[in-house]
UniProtKB/Swiss-Prot annotation:
Keyword Hydrolase: yes
Name the UniProt record assigns to this protein: ATP-dependent RNA helicase-like protein DB10
Motif stretch (DEAD box): 298-301
Stated family: Belongs to the DEAD box helicase family.
Record domain WW: where: 18-52
EC number: 3.6.4.13
Keyword Nucleotide-binding: yes
Domain Helicase C-terminal stretches: 379-523
Helicase ATP-binding domain ranges (all copies): 176-350
GO molecular function: ATP binding; ATP hydrolysis activity; RNA binding; RNA helicase activity
Biased composition (Basic and acidic residues): 99-108, 562-574
């Protein structure tokens, strides 16, 4: 459990917090683990965080773009949540809007973790402005800019420092106090922003307060689009949940169900799962979600892009309507907005950066090289030789065949290894472990690894082939420049990619990057097709109605968008036709132009 260990039920001192006004001190209730505050001169105690009277600021009760708040607000006795701890929802998990509070006793179980202000050396407005934080919602707590200010148990704070983190990232700083109040959240932030710990840390505290019998099912459920991201989330949960003594299992396709079912039968607090595999196990009646009170949708935009919406909605129907729901996404298209409106109640939206346009990480230096296809091999070798030996580098290819071919050519001199959908789970795990350890410092991958792959110290990303859409480009290069580090991205761009030229120019300009003259010329000649549509392909399209054959989203057979409702595997595509772990035959509708993708009636997912 995520508790503060103490020899008795008496209070103990909280970690030193230099932002507290003197002479106030933080104390931890030895029974509940709540943080409260004590003035040794007056012997007053209170849950509200004390603020200097000279610059106390009241929290606005209206929606705000940059939020300012300064103290814990105890819920009034008139505010009550449902008896089982959640907002009122309809029978189909459709929102039944209610002003009721979340806990039946009239107080929040997270009072001690409420709106803890930022340090006196920087105003909350300045912090939000500097980190491009905007918040929509009423009575939103101020960001927590230090681990000590969070009120997390000292063991968790110690683990964060031991992992090399000096302070919360912006998404953590703003989302933690909201989540700790038990509220629903939509958090929109770029990849590499620290979102995983943004929801895991409050999950540990949630477990401390509301842990159920793990033999009867999990308390925490995290849904993830890919097995790679799911296993990484599990690793983070185990790493930072040691002091909380949590049990966590991971459910994903492409691996035998037996070991996963055995772990479930032993009882777990947290389940991290891909939607397809979890649906399989639900249909087998081998897991119950009836105790889940904390639900996370990680990379929600990617899950919808991959067509998981039917599976997600089916899963959510198995989860109690009285729950806390957190949705994390890198982008904010219409589909994500719709499912957020359906599944979340009175949510607070936290934005890091501009969510209305696709923005690349500005800490990544992007080099676009307009080259002929036959020049790519020579150029990639030049780039690899120019880097420090042992530097971790990811090279993205558009097809499995090219991925294998390129890795074979680079293995001898550069220690390259390949990962794609035809690799077994064991092969993938081995290649990733070798890459993480630096024994195979060059990873050649298809887009199966483009989202959710969280490996530290990736110095360079090379786009050997340009992806099928500008969104995937941004997510690919986002493998480097993570957690505040700088990164390099090289992209080979050919005439066959000219339809993406205008969109690429916009991304480069938005990140203050140099735009090559040749690329700008391509865009001026009409490349990109971006003027007739937005980034989400909402313009007129073919049978799928999703923006025509150049839309970067995935389109199933007969215009269907995504995976089959009856899919049996987390990686099966369309009407049960796509399986990332089995060899696939090429469709006869494949265009002879390699760069043109699939026709409008077929899936354009090439991995």
């Amino acid at each position: 459990m995520a508790v503060v260990t103490a020899s008795s039920a008496g209070p103990s001192y909280a970690p030193e917090d230099p932002t507290l006004p003197k002479p106030w001190k933080g104390l931890v209730d030895g029974t509940t683990g709540f943080i409260y505050f004590w003035n040794p001169e007056t012997n007053d105690t209170q849950y509200e965080r004390p603020v200097p009277s000279s610059h106390a600021v009241s929290a606005p009760a209206h929606k705000s773009s940059v939020f300012v708040s300064s103290s814990v607000e105890k819920p009034s006795q008139g505010q009550r949540y449902d008896a089982d701890g959640g907002h009122n929802r309809g029978s189909n998990n459709k929102i039944a809007r209610s002003s009721s509070d979340r806990f039946h006793d009239g107080t929040s179980v997270h009072e001690g973790y409420g709106s803890l202000g930022v340090g006196s050396d920087i105003s909350q407005e300045s912090y939000c402005r500097r980190n491009e934080i905007s918040v929509t919602g009423g009575d939103v707590p101020a960001p927590l800019t230090s681990f000590e200010a969070t009120g997390f148990p000292s063991e968790i704070v110690r683990e964060m420092h031991q992992a090399g983190f000096s302070a919360p990232t912006p998404i953590q700083a703003q989302s933690w106090p909201i989540a700790l109040q038990g509220r629903d959240i939509v958090a929109i932030a770029k990849t590499g922003s620290g979102k995983t710990l943004g929801y895991l840390m409050p999950a540990f505290i949630h477990l401390q307060q509301r842990r159920k019998n793990p033999q009867l099912g999990p308390t925490i459920l995290v849904l993830s689009p890919t097995r790679e991201l799911a296993t990484q989330i599990q690793a983070e949960a185990v790493k930072f949940g040691k002091s909380s003594r949590i049990s966590c299992t991971c459910l994903y396709g492409g691996a035998p169900k037996g070991p996963q079912l055995r772990e479930l039968s032993r009882g777990v607090d947290i389940v991290v799962a891909t939607p397809g595999r979890l649906n399989d196990i639900l249909e087998m009646r081998r897991v119950s979600l009836g105790q889940v009170s904390y639900l996370v949708l990680d990379e929600a935009d990617r899950m919808l892009d991959m067509g998981f919406e039917p599976q997600i909605r089916k899963i959510v129907k198995e989860v109690p309507v009285q729950r806390q729901t957190l949705m994390y996404t890198a982008t904010w298209p219409k589909g994500v907005r719709k499912i957020a409106a359906d599944l979340l109640v009175n949510s607070v939206q936290v934005n890091i950066g501009n969510v209305d346009e696709l923005v690349a990480n500005k800490s990544i230096t992007q080099h676009i090289e307009v080259v002929l296809p036959m020049e790519k091999q020579r150029r990639v070798e030049q780039i690899l030789r120019s880097k420090e030996p042992g530097s971790k580098i990811i090279i993205f290819c558009s097809t499995k065949k090219m991925c294998d071919q390129l890795s074979r050519n680079l293995t001898r001199n550069f220690g390259a290894a390949a990962i794609h959908g035809d690799k077994s789970q064991g092969e993938r795990d081995y290649v990733l472990s070798q890459f993480r350890a630096g024994r195979s410092p060059v990873l050649v991958a298809t887009d199966v690894a483009a989202r959710g792959l969280d490996i530290k110290d990736i110095r360079v990303v090379i786009n050997y082939d340009f992806p099928t859409g500008i969104e995937d480009y941004v997510h690919r290069i986002g493998r480097t420049g993570r957690a505040g580090a700088s990164g390099l991205a090289y992209t080979f761009f050919s005439d066959q990619d000219s339809k993406h030229a205008l969109d690429l120019v916009k991304v480069l300009e938005g990140a203050n990057q140099c735009v090559p003259t040749e690329l700008r010329d391509m865009a001026s000649r009409g490349g990109g097709m971006g003027r007739a549509r937005n980034h989400w392909g909402s313009g007129p399209g073919g049978r799928g109605g999703r923006g025509g054959p150049y839309n970067s989203s995935y389109v199933g057979r007969n215009g269907g968008h995504g995976y089959d409702r009856g899919s049996r595997d987390s990686d099966r595509y369309g009407h049960g036709t796509y399986n990332a772990d089995a060899p696939r035959k090429r469709s006869r509708s494949r265009s002879p132009n390699i760069g043109s993708g699939w026709s409008g009636k077929k899936s354009r997912f090439t991995d």
